[in-house]
Design a protein with these regions (language model features):
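Conserved hydrolase catalytic core segment
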Residues: 164-165, 170-200
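Conserved alpha/beta-hydrolase "acid-adjacent" motif
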Residues: 317-323
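Short beta-strand/loop motif that positions the catalytic acidic residue
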Residues: 304, 310-312
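Catalytic active-site module of serine/aspartate enzymes centered on a nucleophile-bearing elbow/loop
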Residues: 334-369
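Conserved acidic catalytic loop of the alpha/beta-hydrolase fold
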Residues: 145-164
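Catalytic-loop region of hydrolases
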Residues: 45-88, 96-97
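N-terminal cap/lid subdomain of alpha/beta-hydrolase-fold enzymes
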Residues: 73-133
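Alpha/beta-hydrolase-fold enzymes
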Residues: 186-187, 191-267
Length: 369
């Protein structure tokens, strides 16, 4: 989890408590929780960034990239049996540091027990992306392409035939499910946070709105910009923000907190290269692990026969819990957990020490035993 997302989660936690109506008290509580969250977010040890290159990588649309670079980190030691690897796949707006608060000795992903692998997905972080200078010429990659690159890293780069678990959050859950369907022999277990089998109409339309906001910035220049369209990115972040929480949450937090959180979302979006963000969400928009909208999932998901833990958040307006429940019903060995509360989608990234974070961590720890 990035430091910015930790502070955002701390803001969410504060606003989730009873509103006293006194802004000064709210700010004092926020400052204290932000410090605690920042401490929890610090990784137990600084991992070295490594790179794996794939020659002549072919994307699903047929485009071939002469060299595709995947950035990743590893923590912990691979067992003599080579059977203790855990692969953590981040969400759309994050990178390989998304789970830092949960990695280390004695933490959820205990590096005294697991060999933890955290890659940057194709199109972002330090992996090959439009931000490298290719811009609009970067291939229109899919979730399947992201999965194929991560799979190659594990199978060829690290030489692993099996992993103890794959854990994915939102976009990472999309990649994880694709992985389980296409390469079911590799993961012994699968953990999906805010999962679905395909992007629904609500999610696709939200992505269209965000993309339109970016394109309306004069600096966008059809995607061949000389200056990153920061204002368009900021507007996209403001559009995204209210969908990341629930309506009851928005109704009861103090007005200043509402504006502050909206601007934090705008700032997070503005930190991206615009082409990289547009392509990242385009991949999420077209995600469909079933193969045809309007179809039912069971047959397509049959290969994913390993034990699967699905964790959804009540009231999530980005990835509807109903979709996660339906997905759970279609998987041969599924366990479903729903996190209560009104944080909506944000609950999925709640830091350790918060009610949502502890509930998620407890469910994963029990599942990985």
């Amino acid at each position: 989890m990035s430091r910015d997302s930790i502070f955002a989660a701390a803001r969410v936690l504060v606003a989730a408590g009873p509103v006293a109506g006194v802004l000064g008290a709210w700010r004092r509580r926020l400052a204290g929780l932000a410090l605690l969250a920042a401490a929890a977010a610090a990784p137990a040890a600084q991992a070295e960034t490594q790179f794996f290159s794939l020659s002549d990588f072919q994307f699903e649309d047929g485009t071939v990239m002469p060299e595709l670079r995947i950035a990743y980190e590893t923590q912990g030691r691979l067992s003599p049996e080579r059977d203790n690897a855990v692969v953590l796949l981040h969400d759309a707006l994050s990178d390989r540091h998304a789970f830092d608060a949960l990695i280390g000795p004695g933490r959820l992903f205990d590096t005294d027990r697991y060999f933890v692998v955290t890659p940057d997905a194709v199109g972002g972080g330090e992996s090959s992306s439009p931000g490298d200078g290719s811009g609009q010429d970067f291939p229109r990659y899919t979730i399947g392409d992201a999965m194929a690159a991560d799979y190659a890293l594990i199978a060829r780069g690290l030489g692993l035939a099996r992993v103890r678990a794959i854990v994915g959050r939102t976009m990472g859950a999309f990649i994880g499910l694709e992985w389980a369907v296409r390469h079911p022999e590799m993961p012994q277990r699968l953990v999906l946070l805010a999962p679905t089998a395909r992007s629904d109409a609500n999610f696709r339309l939200l992505i269209d709105l965000m993309t339109s906001a970016i394109a309306l910035d004069p600096d966008w220049a059809g995607g061949r910009y000389e200056r990153n369209p920061v204002e368009g990115l900021r507007h996209a972040g403001r559009i995204y923000y209210p969908w990341s929480v629930t309506r009851p949450y928005l109704e009861r937090i103090v007005e200043d907190a509402l504006a502050e959180e909206s601007e934090a979302s705008a700032k997070a979006f503005a930190s991206w290269d615009a082409n990289a963000l547009v392509l990242r969400y385009a991949a999420c928009r077209e995600y469909d692990a079933i193969g045809g909208r309007g179809t039912e999932p069971p047959a397509a998901l049959a290969p994913a026969a390993m034990p699967v833990l699905l964790i959804a958040s009540a009231g999530d307006r980005l990835i509807d819990p109903h979709d996660a429940r339906r997905l759970a019903a279609a998987l041969p060995q599924a366990r479903y957990v729903e996190i209560p509360g009104d944080l909506g989608h944000r609950a999925i990234a709640a830091p350790p020490g918060t009610p949502a974070g502890e509930a998620i961590g407890g469910a994963i720890a029990e599942f990985l035993k």
